[in-house]
Amino acid sequence: NTGYRVQFNSAIGPYKGGLRLHPSVNLGIIKFLGFEQIFKNSLTGLPIGGGKGGSDFDPKGKSDREVMAFCQSFMTELCKYIGADTDVPAGDIGTGAREIGYMFGQYKRIRGLYEGVLTGKGLSYGGSLARTEATGYGLLYFTEELLKINGKDIKGMTVAVSGAGNVAIYAIQKAQQLGAKVVTASDSTGWVYDPDGIDVAALKEIKEVKRARLTEYKKYRPNSEYHEGRGVWSVKVDLALPCATQNELHLEDAKQLVANGCVAVCEGANMPTTLEATQYLQENGVIFAPGKAANAGGVATSA
């Protein structure tokens, strides 16, 4: 495996940005996410510069032991370049509290320092309360305000969400609390459509406890449908929240959303909408919230 860490500008404070563990990771992707991170960090108003890192290691299907071994060797090299006042990495796709914990332990062992060098830690060793929910909740509060400004109410809206990770789960939860009905979720193998509204408890059980695929969802909700591959944006909804990964919403998807009368698209993931799709949505009067503003809750509430 190859590890990466890209740092942009630390003139006003330490670099800050996630560590992504996913087979698709390469230098290009990390640079592009890091560049986006500069603007996202500046929008939080906090004194932090842009950075991003990760590796093409795939934690999927690996045992705790294997993940731990990887995280430790990754940190053995990474620790030379980071520090509480230099660069503070965080979680991202494939990197949750478990992985951050393994890395933090290794950093502490090598450097002999118990400091704020990583964010997204568990509560028992210095993490911040509500960090897990921050990105998804922040996305919905942002969306709610954005709709209000445009004279619309999120209450009663039908929503499509892509993804089934940290951002997606809590975005779905908060959307339901605000009175909207979320009918989709997706992962790397396929997507589910639940006409009665996604069951967050079932989703958490599948994704956070069992770390399984969404195919399991039908066992919990027999009324739902599971579809292989892409297609989450083909459902007729009022609001679309891409919360999976970069470049997941293409021009064709944007055309489908517009045809189905979608009112707004708000990004939960980093750069999930392609440039052509973004332009098409804006030309057709769809309210569009870029991720660098809409998902910045994750940076702001990270410890």
Residue locations for each model-derived region?
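Generic N-terminal targeting/processing segments that precede catalytic cores or assembly contacts
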Residues: 1-39, 47, 56-57, 61
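Predominant activation on well-ordered alpha-helical scaffold segments within soluble catalytic domains
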Residues: 27, 31-35, 68-79, 100-105, ...
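General beta-strand structural signal in soluble alpha/beta enzymes
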Residues: 32, 86-90, 113-118, 161, ...
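Glycine/serine-rich phosphate-binding loop and adjoining beta1-alpha1 elements at the start
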Residues: 41-154
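Short, surface-exposed connector motifs at secondary-structure boundaries
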Residues: 82-85, 152-156, 235-238, 257-264, ...
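Glycine-rich phosphate/diphosphate-binding loop of Rossmann-like nucleotide-binding domains
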Residues: 119-122, 127-236
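Rossmann-fold NAD(P)-binding glycine/threonine-rich loop
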Residues: 244-303
